[in-house]
Amino acid sequence: MNWPVTIGIVVVIVGFVVFKRLSFVSVEVARKHLAAGALVIDVRSPEEFRSGQVPGAINIPLGDLRDSLPRRVKDKNQVLLVHCLSGGRSGMAKQQLKGMGYPNVFNLGSLGRAQQIVAGK
């Protein structure tokens, strides 16, 4: 077996999966959803949330989504814009929420990016 080729293929596949999970919504699409009433969900810890947040965002930590979100968001068709500190946890949240039957979930990415999008900058 040619190990360098095999390892290269694995790296490409893993990279594709990670990119797919972390792909962020465009600024234009996010702003369109915000104007139409999308909810912004911050999946960071409560401590992180208290240190700075997007105006109007709801804090539901990643580990609490499965239990908390259905109680707080009854309409599964509600557009949800998720973010965290860097975009990694929000990528996981997006996948988890889609698996829970929420089809309209978009990853804003990092806190800084989410703040800029919401502020219109």
Regions found by a protein language model. Give the residues of each.
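Rhodanese-like catalytic fold shared by cysteine-dependent sulfurtransferases
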Residues: 2-29, 33-38, 46-79, 88-121
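Short, surface-exposed ligand- or partner-binding patches at beta-edge/loop junctions that are enriched
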Residues: 82-83
